């Protein structure tokens, strides 16, 4: 078993092989899903966006995401059996899946249900999107599936949890792109929302696609153990720095 409370700068397919069967209590992850890419899998310029070739992302040359092109589907499909293997029975796998014209959520839901028991598609309402044209992306999805063999691990029996996460009452806000360190960075509070529902203090949370470390920070702040993998050294270094900052903030209080 790998050492806990660490981010590993390596391919998650290789790293997962070093995790014992039935040893993880919860997975929350944001895999590459082709967000903001053109047909070549490249983040595109403002001019290309204006010509209808995709959605503009600032600083594209420094913010590219590995394996975020057409290969994203295949990578996710290959990961499903490994995520299932390491999870304990009754535990949940929560996967962010974007929101947009590509019905990726439909494909991924069906693939998850072939191995897990598909539980729900959660809609994260990101609030008003401002000025624009055509359909604006005001939501993203999170797919929740559980490993069969035991009752679903659910740790909030006092509230009816809607399948729409609305920012006005959950305290979860959309990250302003210019302030994000990763092009698809999620709010720490979003990860906390799922971590608290599907795990307890001291249990282990896994993020195979850690990016800039949001899931790991949320796990740390909620007193969970964690393991994360990130292939790209650029993002792994940023995640490590964010984790160290979170650790220092914790010791202040």
Residue ranges, per PLM feature:
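Core catalytic lobe of class I
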Residues: 1-229, 234-237
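Short, conserved SAM-binding/catalytic segment
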Residues: 1-2, 240-253
């Amino acid at each position: 078993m790998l050492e806990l409370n660490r981010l590993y700068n390596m391919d998650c397919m290789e790293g997962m092989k070093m995790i014992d069967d039935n040893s993880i209590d919860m997975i929350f992850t944001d895999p590459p899903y082709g967000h903001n890419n053109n047909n070549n899998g490249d983040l595109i310029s403002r001019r290309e966006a204006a010509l209808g070739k995709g959605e503009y992302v600032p600083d594209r040359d420094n913010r590219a995401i590995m394996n975020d092109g057409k290969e994203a589907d295949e990578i996710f499909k290959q990961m499903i059996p490994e995520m299932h293997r390491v999870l304990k029975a009754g535990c949940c796998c929560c996967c962010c899946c974007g929101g947009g014209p590509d019905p990726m959520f439909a494909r991924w839901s069906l693939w998850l249900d072939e191995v897990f028991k598909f539980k729900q598609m959660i809609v994260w309402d990101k609030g008003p999107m401002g000025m624009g044209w055509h359909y604006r992306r005001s939501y993203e999805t999170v797919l929740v599936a559980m490993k069969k063999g035991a009752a679903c691990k659910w740790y909030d029996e006092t509230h009816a949890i809607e399948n729409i996460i609305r920012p006005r009452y959950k305290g979860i806000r959309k990250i302003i792109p210019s302030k994000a360190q990763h092009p698809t960075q999620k709010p720490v509070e979003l990860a906390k929302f799922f971590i608290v529902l599907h795990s307890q203090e001291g249990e282990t949370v896994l993020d195979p696609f850690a990016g800039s470390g949001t899931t790991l920070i949320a796990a740390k702040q909620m007193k969970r153990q964690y393991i994360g993998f990130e292939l790209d050294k650029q993002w792994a270094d940023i995640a490590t720095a964010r984790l160290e900052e979170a650790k220092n903030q914790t010791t202040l209080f």
